Design a protein with these regions (language model features):
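General small-molecule cofactor/ligand-binding pocket signal
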Residues: 122, 191, 269
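Short Gly/charged-rich anion-binding patches and loops
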Residues: 37, 71, 127, 151, ...
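Catalytic core of membrane glycerolipid acyltransferases/transacylases, capturing the structured
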Residues: 101, 135-194, 206, 220-233, ...
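Membrane-anchoring hydrophobic helices of lipid-metabolizing enzymes
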Residues: 2-143, 176-178, 187
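Non-catalytic C-terminal accessory region of glycerolipid acyltransferases
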Residues: 2-10, 16-19, 26, 89-93, ...
Length: 319
C-alpha cells in the first residue's frame, strides 16, 4: 500500500490531522515561507489600509491575469447574456478586488484571536440555524463558492459552530499543512474528497455542521443538467439523499467580504424543502445560488470551470 493510500484510509476514519515534515524547510519552499511571513505581518495591519493596498494591487493586475479572467468572461457571458461588455468587465474587476482583499486578510483569519474574529463577522439570518438546532436537527450548510468561503468556515467555529467539510488536498504539501492547520484550529474536521462522503456524513451525525460546496462541475455521469442563471449547468443531484443519510436539514448560506464595513458577512436562508426528484432538488440548489449571487456577483468565484460539461460535448474553456 502506498503512503497516499494509507493517508486516505486514516483520514476516512478520523479526518485529516496535519503533521509537520522537515522537508517543508527545503530551499524550494522558502518563497512560500516568505509569503506566509508577509501575510502574518498584514494580519496586524488595520483592515482599511490593507484593503486599500489590496485594491490597488488588484486593479494593477486585473487585466494581466490571463486564463482566470477568460474563464470569468465566458461564465458571465453565458449566465448574463444581456450584460454589456462594460458591465461584465466592471464585475470582473470588482471580483479581483474582492479576491485580493480576502487573500491579504488570510493571515488575520489564520492567527488572530477568537474574540477578534467574532468582531470582524456579521450574520444575517442566524435564527435559521438556531431554530434548527433547537428542534434537534443535524445541519448541512449549502455554501456556494464565495471568495470568503474559507474565512467564514473558520469564523463559524469561533461562534460555537464546529464544521466538517470535504476538500481537495493542495498539490503543495506545505501549503496543504498550513491551511489545514488554520481551518481546524478552532475545531472541526477536514476530509479528503477522495475518501468519499461517508466520513463527512459521520461527523454531521456526531453534531458538527456539514459545510457543503454545491457548485463544482463533476461531469455528466454524476450530474443532471438543470437551469443556472440564463444557461444550464451539470449539477450534482444528491443533496436530498445526503440530507436523509445524515438526518439533517439543508440550510443555504453565502459568505461575503464587505469592504465598507470591514466584516465577513454570512447570509443564512431558511432550510430548503428538497424534492425526491433529483432534477427538482438540483434546480432548487441552483435557485439558492442565484438568489445569493445576483445582488453581489463580484463575491462569487467566476474563475472556476463552472460550466465545463456541455450537452453537446463542446469545450468552452481554453486549455
Amino acid at each position: 500500500m502506498t503512503d497516499s493510500q494509507k493517508k486516505l484510509r486514516i483520514t476516512a476514519r478520523a479526518g485529516y490531522e496535519p503533521h509537520f515534515s522537515w522537508s517543508y524547510l527545503h530551499p524550494k519552499n522558502w518563497g512560500i515561507w516568505l509569503g506566509i511571513f508577509v501575510l502574518l505581518l498584514l494580519a496586524f495591519v488595520p483592515f482599511r489600509l490593507r484593503d486599500k493596498m489590496a485594491e490597488k494591487l488588484a486593479r494593477a493586475l486585473a487585466k494581466k491575469i490571463g486564463k482566470p479572467r477568460i474563464r470569468a468572461e465566458i461564465n458571465l457571458k453565458l449566465c448574463f447574456p444581456d450584460w454589456t461588455d462594460e458591465q461584465r468587465n466592471k464585475v470582473i474587476e470588482e471580483m479581483f478586488v474582492t479576491v485580493a482583499q480576502v487573500m491579504l486578510g488570510i493571515g488575520e483569519i489564520a492567527i488572530r484571536s477568537k474574540k477578534h474574529l467574532q468582531k470582524r463577522s456579521e450574520f444575517i439570518g442566524l435564527e435559521h440555524i438556531k431554530q434548527a438546532k433547537a428542534e434537534g436537527h443535524n445541519i448541512i450548510l449549502m455554501v456556494p463558492h464565495g471568495w470568503a468561503i474559507d474565512a467564514s468556515g473558520i469564523i463559524l467555529h469561533t461562534h460555537g459552530m464546529p464544521m466538517t467539510s470535504m476538500y481537495n488536498p493542495h498539490r503543495n504539501p506545505l501549503v496543504d499543512w498550513l491551511w489545514t492547520l488554520a481551518r481546524q484550529r478552532f475545531g472541526g474536521k477536514m476530509h479528503a474528497r477522495q475518501n468519499g462522503i461517508k466520513p463527512f456524513l459521520a461527523h454531521i451525525k456526531q453534531g458538527q455542521m456539514g459545510y457543503y460546496l454545491p457548485d463544482e462541475d463533476f461531469g455528466a455521469e454524476q450530474s443532471v443538467f438543470v437551469d443556472f442563471f440564463a444557461t444550464y449547468k451539470a449539477t450534482l443531484p444528491g443533496l436530498n439523499k445526503m440530507a436523509k443519510l445524515a438526518k439533517a436539514v439543508v440550510i443555504p448560506m453565502f459568505p461575503r467580504y464587505n469592504a465598507k464595513s470591514g466584516k465577513y458577512e454570512m447570509e443564512i436562508r431558511p432550510p430548503m424543502q428538497l424534492s425526491e426528484d433529483p432534477e427538482q432538488s438540483a434546480r432548487a440548489m441552483n435557485e439558492e445560488i442565484e438568489y445569493f449571487v445576483t445582488p453581489t456577483p463580484e463575491q462569487y468565484v467566476w474563475i472556476l470551470q463552472l460550466l465545463r460539461t456541455r450537452k453537446d460535448g463542446e469545450d468552452i474553456y481554453p486549455d
